[in-house]
Amino acid sequence: MFNITNIQSTARHQSISNEASTEVPLKEEIWNKISAFFSSEHQVEAQNCIAYLCHPPETASPEEIKSKFECLRMLAFPAYADNIQYSRGGADQYCILSENSQEILSIVFNTEGYTVEGGGKSVTYTRVTESEQASSASGSKDAVNYELIWSEWVKEAPAKEAANREEAVQRMRDCLKNNKTELRLKILGLTTIPAYIPEQITTLILDNNELKSLPENLQGNIKTLYANSNQLTSIPATLPDTIQEMELSINRITELPERLPSALQSLDLFHNKISCLPENLPEELRYLSVYDNSIRTLPAHLPSEITHLNVQSNSLTALPETLPPGLKTLEAGENALTSLPASLPPELQVLDVSKNQITVLPETLPPTITTLDVSRNALTNLPENLPAALQIMQASRNNLVRLPESLPHFRGEGPQPTRIIVEYNPFSERTIQNMQRLMSSVDYQGPRVLFAMGDFSIVRVTRPLHQAVQGWLTSLEEEDVNQWRAFEAEANAAAFSGFLDYLGDTQNTRHPDFKEQVSAWLMRLAEDSALRETVFIIAMNATISCEDRVTLAYHQMQEATLVHDAERGAFDSHLAELIMAGREIFRLEQIESLAREKVKRLFFIDEVEVFLGFQNQLRESLSLTTMTRDMRFYNVSGITESDLDEAEIRIKMAENRDFHKWFALWGPWHKVLERIAPEEWREMMAKRDECIETDEYQSRVNAELEDLRIADDSDAERTTEVQMDAERAIGIKIMEEINQTLFTEIMENILLKKEVSSLMSAYWR
């Protein structure tokens, strides 16, 4: 077994020549010159080898140095393998050459010791004799016998944990052997960890275990400690002062020690049971999150370096009058605040105080604020002077009855018009229409204000579901009434009841066939629990504003019914009807996309009116069978005749061009395929799996990644991150291409076999 106290060869630093320090550490300088030698999956391991070679530990031997060079050669692309040389000009000479064959790092061993040269510096080491080593080891009080400590830790393990502790020890041995600085002990079900871990470890990850505590005497040079999702109830006051970042989210911590690591810069304690914070938090702290705890008050003086403070979802009734001067983000939503400090930090950019009890905002807010969320409070007015940098303000669900008179003249500093969201406030319909006319004028350059139509002063009483259904199905038998009464226990049944009552007040009830349509649909819902569950969910927010939102929700329910029928086999023997159903869903998706474009260009207009307006007005020209005929507020939707003409043309062109590809990837069609052509479906899926599991997929990814020629960054970690992001994006793109090819092929074959392939031809002339 490996024992760190049983060392075969050691060295001591003898002399340094050319000692002028460089701005870039040697390991980074070398890495920046050779990072292109390695693929993205080998970058981290190669970087660790370079770090070791630039600063060999005192235990380095020729064999260990050689093993690192051999490892680098194996990891490198074949074209660069010869740039990493060992046994060059002698058994104990090693070097790395840059792309232009310039020597950038060399290590030379001799009988006296070894020399490391790189970056214009030369460091020489001499070996310690065996007797010196023995004397040093016997006289050292700090030598740690890791194997003894770890073996005892494994012996103490409960039976169900023993195997995972062995796995943890293997990972720690690997860190020792390969000089790794990151130790991952995630998801091992550990109830404790040993106090002694390899001293070179700077990142310790203990997430998703069953730890109830951390060691009081945790050793090492840890800079980053993650112990999220455990069962911790406290934090030792003796954690290493080297820790700079600590995440202990989703635990059971009830209090913090008065002393935390002095170097701590980032502390995340999301979802614990903390009731108060220590008065003296570390002065270096920059990020503090105690989101979702039970804190009632904050210290009067928080560290001055904090730039991000998240105290959301606690029990705070007030914030400190003096907040850190450099604070840029303050998240204090879901508390019991009734006011804000009179003076907020001058550099504040993000302020979230939503879901509180605030009645008034400071008349002057910091001009640097770009994002302001004061929704779900008790505000009756907004400040006349909004922050100059404001980009988005969320003020929904307050008691606002008017907007600042200065609002139309406000000019934000951002590249886009400021968005001010004031939905679900008690504005009158007349006030909303006046604002819409003002903000829709040609020369208007003020903020874009979003609101919801409707009279919010009306309070509706939600009836029991069976009574709401009887309003549509007047001749229900007692047995049917009892059936709907039983459905009242299902999730969101009350929301659906309110929806039905509100639907009866919409413009569409003027048409007799509308009631017949709804009645038939309700009878279907009574027989289909899965469809009923989907419809009840859609009803959740259907009645929170105007009747047009109710109508839009009804459209969504009809669309969901159509998809449900396709998935459950209603069209298995009627593929022509399935394709027509798919065409309707495709057209509705296109309408939604165009409506979103229109919403971006309008001011003071409820987006519900825009979405419903396009659906309603294009109902006949696009043969939309699931859409109703009428809506109430089309006159304030902002949609013009030219908008409708353009939308119709664009949607028909898109359908002729793209429906074939869209239908091939449509989920309900796949469900039909599995039922009507199970053998062909299995063969196609096997072919798809083969594409992924063989070299074809990775070869295509590598080829496109190579074409990108991602430039090296002076920040090696940043370069690796960019390459990983690019590889992920390319992988998704290629997977989509593979899916499109295979799903299109099987679609064409099955439709041809069923003699309905002509239905995929261009629909519009």
UniProtKB/Swiss-Prot annotation:
Signal peptide span: none
Main localization category: secreted
Post-translational modification (record): Ubiquitinated in the presence of host E1 ubiquitin-activating enzyme, E2 ubiquitin-conjugating enzyme and ubiquitin.
Annotated segments matching region Linker: 454-461
Any single GO BP term: protein ubiquitination
Subcellular location: Secreted; Host cytoplasm
Catalytic activity from the UniProt record: S-ubiquitinyl-[E2 ubiquitin-conjugating enzyme]-L-cysteine + [acceptor protein]-L-lysine = [E2 ubiquitin-conjugating enzyme]-L-cysteine + N(6)-ubiquitinyl-[acceptor protein]-L-lysine
Entry domain remark: The LRR (leucine-rich repeat) domain forms a slightly curved solenoid and may mediate interaction with target proteins.
Protein name: E3 ubiquitin-protein ligase SlrP
Organism this protein belongs to: Salmonella typhimurium (strain 14028s / SGSC 2262)
